[in-house]
Amino acid sequence: MKHRIQHIHFVGVGGSGMSGIAEVLLNLGYTVSGSDLSESTVTRRLADLGLKVSIGHAAENVADADAIVTSTAVAGDNPEVIAARLARIPVVPRAVMLAELMRLKRGIAVAGTHGKTTTTSLVASVLAAGGLDPTFVIGGRLNSAGANAQLGQGEFIVVEADESDASFLNLLPVMAIITNIDADHMDTYGHDVARLKSAFIEFTQRLPFYGSAVLCADDANVREIMPFVSRPITTYGLSSDAQVRAENVQADGTRMRFSVRRQGREQDLPTLEVELNLPGLHNVRNALAAIAVASELGVADAAICQALAGFKGVGRRFTQWGEFPVAEAQGGGRYSVIDDYGHHPVEMAATLAAARGAWPDRRIVLAFQPHRYTRTRDCFEDFVRVLGTADAVLLTEVYAAGEAPLVAADGRALARALRVAGKVEPLFVEDVAALPQAVRDFMRDGDVLILMGAGSISKVPSQLGEHA
């Protein structure tokens, strides 16, 4: 690629899926520039690394580029896209550029509706602990690396494969992990679950004849596609027939302890005694996927256990912000704050269950900002059911993510339905900007607050200390 393409420009470079690819290309020696609508910690970090970042989109930003990279969030009438097409500069989808990066290494791609970012991070961390020095491109910030991407000197590249727009079908990994298959982003698949499953089958068919698939045996939809996977399979989970299986699972605060039995191709491998620095059964499954990959690649058992015990987490995945003071009007004291990206009912249920396991005797308060009107509509009853499992709920208006409002699929409708269900009396806070003060007025000593959503609620944790 480099003999013809030297300067690559990213439209929307601050996006989680874009910034990592840009950083790796910069470290490979390419000239990389990018633009975004607003400045952020991501764009500032990229600028510090030497990437030229423009705030705002303008035709002149692409004047010297040999190729421009776009994500599905970038519209066709973007001035940089128009200018590139007029100048016959190639306009490359993000997933296609990621596929080009993967051609330089042996690719390990993590797909699935939930758990991709954490699983990708765990795989990268375990391989790094085993001395394999992988390159990785992740959809979230790996805390131990301080970044969501890193260029390693080893032969493997570990990437997060995005099914939301079916772009994961551009990738050509040698190992494919599927964590689960659930109904989300169904506009892409014509609201047809069969088409969604077919896409995951096709994803495994992109593997070479010497490739392999690592599949979660606990997920019913993943089990359904197994007969159609034509490559060697390693299954993982808590199911009795999983080849990499967790037993004796116990919560220890925000850590999990469990034993792992592993069926080898010729003989069983030694049982591992694992301490995972993450809470919840869903994270036990994510760790099992990483263990399956590492065992296949010959990573030493001690390195696997060390990486999992010392895992420092991923940004906005059950991120603990510490304790904050309770207002004197509420009796004083302290409450704990957790920040989480979860925005689908399945993810929310897993996070709430993890919190219950970590703090069984404390009040769990959920502050939730729904993400997209279409998801709120499609998962409405499931949202009501999951929200009702919290001890108390603060609910904001939907974060639109560019969508037009839908009747009976907004935050008020969710609050009404939750009230009718009778399990919890929600506090509706229409403007998320008012949420920090609402939280201060609501919390009591010993409470655990979980701030959850994929939108602007991510800014709230840093605002809670103000005026406390």
Swiss-Prot record:
Q: What is its EC number?
A: 6.3.2.8
Q: Does the keyword NADP apply?
A: no
Its pathway?
Cell wall biogenesis; peptidoglycan biosynthesis
| SUPFAM superfamilies from the UniProt entry | MurCD N-terminal domain (SSF51984), MurD-like peptide ligases, catalytic domain (SSF53623), MurD-like peptide ligases, peptide-binding domain (SSF53244)
Signal peptide residue numbers: none
**What are the recorded GO MF terms, alphabetically?**
ATP binding; UDP-N-acetylmuramate-L-alanine ligase activity
BP GO terms, sorted: cell division; cell wall organization; peptidoglycan biosynthetic process; regulation of cell shape
Q: Which HAMAP family match?
A: MurC
Entry protein name: UDP-N-acetylmuramate--L-alanine ligase
Instruction: Write down the species.
Output: Bordetella avium (strain 197N)
Lineage of the organism: Bacteria, Pseudomonadati, Pseudomonadota, Betaproteobacteria, Burkholderiales
